[in-house]
């Protein structure tokens, strides 16, 4: 009897185990079908036509005007912001301090064949989510499986291999067809005359016409130490730059340093100090030269950077705040004025006696120089290498296309002016700021004359525009600081055009608080990561040229060499956006 009961119990347990195995098999099959559906949707999103050759392509303002067309980009949709950006916090994105985080990749034809359009990617994710909700455990159970993550990684890497293979095949075909020809260059930009008063942006007239002039400029003695109010700034300012800002008027007292305009210090946390002085902050002194009431409890100020300073962090009293974020607490510190050493050209120390009268005669200048060289032991190449005049002439030739006619003659001011208008890399900007020698600063600048540089998105590293397309819409140069209605300060770089398919648009165009009178502004976003990178400016008044240009925000772009250029850099973008969409649907 006991044997019969045990046999019946064993048979029941066996049937239960079979049912459990069958349920597990069905569950695993459902998971495999869901992953297969994702992979099929992923593969369906891949077009079969070959990728076009990787060349520079641009939004040409002349072509837009000639064709009479409007901006071709569609309005972008909201997506999550990039929490892996290099900046700690995403800055204000437009002139009204709204923060768009949007993108529209529905234009499939504008993408390379290896990159998955976001609308198809979203459809695939939505299908996976809807199927996963019909089973026990939901999406969390699906994502917990190693099989799913392995399949996702496999799909992503397969697209990367396909992209690399396509690029190699394209390069080989181009090399076979044109073995002796150089690589394709960017299309030349037709010369455009500036039909705009470049004095208007420099006056910051968007603040209004009620500003009062504050006379006087005070230069402090080199090496002296002064106690003054200090702020932080997210951009590096060089002496000579104008810093407009909006702040509570109670932050400044009448008894602060300055014979006429108030003097305060601005330091740059992004400027890494030398290794031997890790507890130092570097910055500049700024002096207010115009101010006026805004009517909202804040005061508009226009200030100019004067001298470089260094601050010992141990001397700071209080918590320093960013000047662009409406600071409410005062912070004081002792600051030391840094020197500017300039050595004249070597040949100027050679006394030629009565022959010196020929030095200033243009027709005799070259002969006089050769005669000077014959009396010294220095080779002519060495003298030419350190000649201030040769550096100025080469810089003038490089900046000729930017239509800048305000190049200073003072070597000290010129060295800072060239840094702002030649757009050096962040590493080079740091070196030029920290050096006390004007000659060394000019030599560092000269070493960059042969480099071709581009603007890259600071968030996803995609290329946006060529630095050779910079031009001056302000008499101060191609790079100028502007302030929006909320007090946020934007470092803006003006370019004729941007690389095609590199940008999208957000919001509606507006003429309110325009930094360039007669132009409307429209927010532009990076096409890959949907982060704010600047504005498009389009003329709304007749007889203004250029009709269209772009302003790139310094906090959203970085300068890099042309060797870093890649037509598309979307692998990280694809993975990040897919995982963020899955995460958002799980919440």
Swiss-Prot record:
Q: Give every CULT domain span.
A: 452-561
Which parts of the chain are coiled coil? none
Q: Which Cys residues form disulphide pairs?
A: none
Give its localization: Nucleus
Q: In which pathway does it act?
A: Protein modification; protein ubiquitination
User: Which residues participate in Zn(2+) binding?
Assistant: 457, 460, 526, 529
Q: Where is the composition biased (Basic and acidic residues)?
A: 159-168
One GO biological-process annotation of the entry reads:
positive regulation of Wnt signaling pathway
Q: How does it assemble?
A: Likely a component of a DCX (DDB1-CUL4-X-box) protein ligase complex. May interact with pic/DDB1.
List the protein's name. Answer: Protein cereblon
UniProt organism field: Drosophila simulans (Fruit fly)
> Its gene?
ohgt
């Amino acid at each position: 009897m006991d044997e019969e009961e045990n046999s019946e119990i064993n048979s029941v347990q066996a049937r239960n185990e079979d049912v459990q195995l069958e349920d597990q098999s069905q569950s695993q099959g459902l998971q495999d079908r869901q992953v297969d559906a994702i992979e099929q949707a992923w593969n369906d999103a891949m077009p079969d036509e070959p990728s076009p050759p990787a060349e520079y392509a641009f939004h040409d303002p002349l072509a837009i005007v000639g064709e009479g067309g409007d901006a071709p980009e569609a309005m972008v949709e909201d997506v999550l912001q990039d929490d892996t950006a290099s900046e700690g916090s995403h800055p204000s994105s437009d002139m009204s301090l709204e923060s768009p985080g949007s993108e529209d990749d529905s234009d499939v034809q504008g993408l390379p064949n290896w990159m998955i359009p976001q609308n198809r990617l979203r459809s695939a994710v939505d299908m996976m989510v809807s199927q996963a909700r019909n089973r026990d455990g939901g999406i969390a159970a699906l994502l917990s499986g190693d099989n799913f993550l392995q399949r996702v990684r496999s799909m992503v890497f397969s697209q990367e291999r396909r992209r690399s293979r396509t690029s190699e095949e394209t390069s080989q075909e181009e090399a076979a067809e044109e073995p002796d020809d150089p690589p394709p260059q960017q299309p030349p930009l037709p010369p455009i005359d500036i039909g705009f008063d470049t004095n208007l942006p420099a006056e910051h007239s968007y603040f209004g016409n009620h500003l009062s002039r504050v006379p006087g400029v005070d230069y402090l003695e080199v090496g002296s130490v002064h106690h003054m109010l200090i702020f932080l700034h997210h951009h590096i300012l060089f002496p000579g730059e104008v810093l407009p800002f909006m702040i509570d008027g109670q932050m400044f007292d009448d008894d602060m340093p300055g014979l006429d305009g108030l003097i305060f210090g601005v330091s740059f946390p992004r400027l890494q100090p030398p290794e031997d002085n890790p507890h130092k902050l570097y910055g500049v002194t700024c002096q207010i030269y115009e101010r006026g009431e805004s009517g909202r409890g804040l005061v508009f100020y226009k200030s100019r950077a004067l001298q470089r300073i260094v601050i010992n962090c141990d001397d700071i009293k209080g918590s320093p705040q960013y000047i662009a974020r409406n600071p409410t607490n005062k912070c004081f510190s002792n600051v030391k004025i840094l020197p500017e050493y300039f050595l004249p050209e070597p040949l100027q120390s050679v006394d030629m006696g009565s022959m010196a009268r020929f030095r200033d005669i243009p027709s005799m200048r070259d002969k006089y120089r050769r005669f000077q060289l014959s009396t010294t032991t220095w080779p002519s190449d060495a003298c030419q290498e350190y000649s201030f005049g040769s550096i100025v002439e080469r810089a003038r030739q490089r900046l000729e296309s930017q239509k800048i006619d305000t190049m200073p003659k003072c070597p000290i001011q010129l060295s800072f002016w060239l840094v702002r208008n030649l757009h050096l890399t962040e590493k080079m900007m740091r070196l030029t700021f920290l050096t006390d020698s004007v000659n060394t600063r000019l030599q560092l600048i000269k070493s960059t004359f042969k480099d071709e540089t581009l603007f890259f998105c600071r968030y996803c590293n995609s290329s946006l525009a060529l630095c050779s397309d910079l031009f001056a819409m302000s008499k101060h140069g191609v790079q100028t600081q502007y302030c929006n209605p909320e007090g946020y300060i934007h470092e803006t770089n003006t370019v004729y055009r941007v690389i095609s398919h590199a940008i999208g648009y957000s919001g509606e165009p507006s003429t309110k608080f325009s930094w360039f009178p007669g132009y409307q502004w429209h927010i532009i976003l990076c096409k890959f990561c949907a982060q704010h990178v600047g504005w498009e400016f389009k003329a709304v008044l007749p007889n203004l040229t250029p009709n269209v240009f772009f302003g790139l925000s310094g906090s959203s772009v970085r300068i890099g060499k042309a060797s870093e250029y890649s037509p598309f850099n979307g692998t990280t973008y694809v993975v990040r956006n897919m995982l963020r969409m899955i995460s958002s649907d799980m919440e």
